[in-house]
């Protein structure tokens, strides 16, 4: 009987991907059906519209998709939406770059129109990329955060929190990005190592005693409101309650003690300005100090209240940049012999995450969500959530423990969700909030009912992007038509580790305030994809790889395989070697399936009742254990571990050993019908199961093989994950199989050492062992795979370390 394969010689991934994407879309394979009781809801990270996605983004989005596909195959009704975060500063920066405009220089409406245009273009590009990768989103659940539906949800959240007393507006110190001219939250501040100078400056007390101050911010001397020393520092205890004179500016400031001063840092005497850093804010609040703000929102010195004459130093400093002011102050101090020492240093400087520029702390009216007063409650919420890996929970706990500022949610930008607020000019009225039924509203374009434009002032700020993104678990309500903010804890939040302090934390906060609930039961945290030099991939650094180029070269399955080879929570260096391994796996899977396809017509639906032979039972037992391990790993979101078990079985047990030993029985050469049926049913069952377990990782090739061999719907259908069936497991047959493989490996080694082909015929295969009998089918398979004419068993002597000692006599 001539057997023919159902497969072409080479797998053509481009043709397959195009065909299957159209097929999956046509049959709505990933559609959420809203079935009660079998829900698995994923809180998907909406990619920011800030430029093209690079391979690092692909890396983490694939991780979520592995879980979505697995849960769907378990029989769950998976709600897997996709959103795009297209409001806020990142999108504004992109638009300014592409359109070569500045938001501040054109009409607000015109700029917002440009933002909408650019956002729509990039959303379509992202969609095409995600579909090319086989990400199994339900595109009917698509949203974007500047849409009217999301604006309404975000404004509803604001009003609800305002009515609860959890949101307030206040004039207080805030972090200010002078480059983007907006307030930012603490989480948007990062530290950068920069070179600077530590300058030691001569101050004097009011009584004339000389005292020295070391500072990196001499330009803030006009804003100095106190000097501090540690109460245990005997050098300065006599100064308590005295006043100091700030050199060249002449302002008189109190000298006070505080435990926060480090005795061994600088001179031990510290200048407190409004405001140089967070410690200044702490002292200003604690000691009820005066306020002297000298930095403008544009990052220049504002000394108009200090200027007595235009030719004074204050006059020269007014309106110049911070860097230039620092230089002028130091030059003046030096001329006056008040600059004692100027030492070049490297130190950490707090910078705005987006612009990269050093931040300032200014006094400004802003909106805040209360955080500090509920730190304990938030820690309790954090501990109710399952964190994968568990170590990531410590990050957010440390962040919450260290919080001492409420969350500033207002931004002085343009393309964002407006605050639904007007400020009344009527007597005894302050803030006007619209009715929820009027939302969404833009107060700059709408008047509150019963008011004229002369009676109100619109709030022109927009909300922090995170104030909206942190409501992502509730976004599904825009598809269910619920006119509220429902929150059933999602099954899973998947995200990367760098936004634990922002997206994860803020979402936990919102869920606690709105529903006294956790937002999700589980959180799965991915690491970063790093460039070859182990730095984070970034478009601005020029080290980011473009996914489309790699998809054209390797195909989606290989890219997904690469993404799966990363431990949860761990950073992974991009590797061409892993891509080559993925390519090799695709080729081997195709070729192995091509071989099995010759026999599948006999057993389209494998019947394990036909499995009678020892080595068939061995491979089924090994397969059973892989199903158990892969299922256990997927259940705790360890996709990498699951893939490792599956791939190890495929290469080692299935391809290297089982396919070789079973060929003779599969072809039906000189074997009984029973032996042949046992082989082909086992082959079909093992391949089908392997395809199903690989399907979450490599959806295209597994679907192509499955649909070619088995006329049984899509491999990605519900309830298609292999069942853990204990009847597959036979410990005795497994041990016989392991003995078989040990003997086979010894024979292969003998032939290799003799530089003979593995097909070289053996006349006599001699197995030395104690009290060991082998089943007939076992011996027949061993003869076939070793190409041995006879097997001879001898009693082994006790001094051998190995269980078996194998020798051969080759045919002459």
Curated annotation (Swiss-Prot):
Localization per record: Cytoplasm
Biological process, per Gene Ontology: valyl-tRNA aminoacylation
Keywords on record: Aminoacyl-tRNA synthetase, ATP-binding, Cytoplasm, Ligase, Nucleotide-binding, Protein biosynthesis
Recorded catalytic activity of this chain's protein: tRNA(Val) + L-valine + ATP = L-valyl-tRNA(Val) + AMP + diphosphate
Residues annotated for ATP binding in this entry: 539
Entry keyword Cytoplasm: yes
EC number(s) per entry: 6.1.1.9
SUPFAM superfamilies for this protein: Anticodon-binding domain of a subclass of class I aminoacyl-tRNA synthetases, Nucleotidylyl transferase, ValRS/IleRS/LeuRS editing domain
Record flagged with keyword Hydrolase: no
First-level EC class: ligase
Family under the similarity heading: Belongs to the class-I aminoacyl-tRNA synthetase family. ValS type 2 subfamily.
Function, as annotated: Catalyzes the attachment of valine to tRNA(Val). As ValRS can inadvertently accommodate and process structurally similar amino acids such as threonine, to avoid such errors, it has a 'posttransfer' editing activity that hydrolyzes mischarged Thr-tRNA(Val) in a tRNA-dependent manner.
Subunit and interaction comment: Monomer.
Name recorded for this polypeptide: Valine--tRNA ligase
